[in-house]
C-alpha cells in the first residue's frame, strides 16, 4: 500500500497508537521496578511480561507504518501513573488499557467506515489483544480484591463510536 493511499486520519490513529503503546511500555517497566523494590517479585515479573507484550505491539505498529511508507513518530508520552499499592497500580493500568481499547475500537470502526479493510484488520487485531490484557488485569484485580469491575470482553460490542 502506498502512503498516498492511506487516509490521513488512519495515519493519525497509527501515530497515537504508537504513543499509547510506548506509554504502556514505560508504565509497566517502571511499575516492575517499583513493585520489585517493594519486595513483590511475582508482581514485578508480571509487569515485565506486560512490558514485553506492549513493546511487541509498538514494534508491530512501527513495522506497519514502515510498510505503508510512513516514518513512525510517536507524539508525547503520558507520564507514568503512580499509586501507593499494587491494587492502585493495577487500577491505573486498567485506565491505560481502557484508553488503548477505546482507541483501537474507534480506529477499526473508522477504517470500516472508509472501507480500509487492511488497516481495519490491523487495528481490530490490536483491539483483541488489548481486550485480552484488560480481562487479565480485571482477573488480577479480582484476585487482590480490587475495586474495579470492567467489561473488557464486551467493550465495543454494540457501541457506537463517533468518527
Question: What annotation goes with each model-predicted range?
Answer:
Residues 1-163:
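Iron-associated oxidoreductase/ferritin-like identity signal
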Amino acid at each position: 500500500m502506498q502512503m498516498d493511499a492511506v487516509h490521513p486520519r488512519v495515519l493519525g490513529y497509527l501515530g497515537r497508537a504508537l504513543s499509547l503503546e510506548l506509554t504502556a511500555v514505560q508504565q509497566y517497566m517502571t511499575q516492575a521496578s517499583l513493585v520489585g523494590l517493594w519486595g513483590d517479585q511475582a508482581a514485578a515479573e508480571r509487569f515485565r511480561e506486560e512490558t514485553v507484550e506492549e513493546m511487541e505491539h509498538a514494534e508491530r505498529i512501527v513495522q506497519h507504518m514502515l510498510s505503508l511508507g510512513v516514518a513512525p513518530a510517536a507524539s508525547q508520552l503520558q507520564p507514568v501513573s503512580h499509586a501507593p499499592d499494587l491494587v492502585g497500580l493495577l487500577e491505573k493500568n486498567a485506565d491505560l488499557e481502557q484508553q488503548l481499547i477505546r482507541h483501537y475500537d474507534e480506529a477499526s470502526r473508522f477504517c470500516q467506515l472508509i472501507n480500509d479493510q487492511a488497516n481495519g484488520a490491523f487495528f481490530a487485531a490490536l483491539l483483541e489483544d488489548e481486550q485480552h490484557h484488560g480481562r487479565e488485569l480485571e482477573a488480577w484485580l479480582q484476585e487482590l480484591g480490587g475495586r474495579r469491575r470492567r467489561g473488557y470482553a464486551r467493550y465495543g460490542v454494540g457501541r457506537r463510536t463517533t468518527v
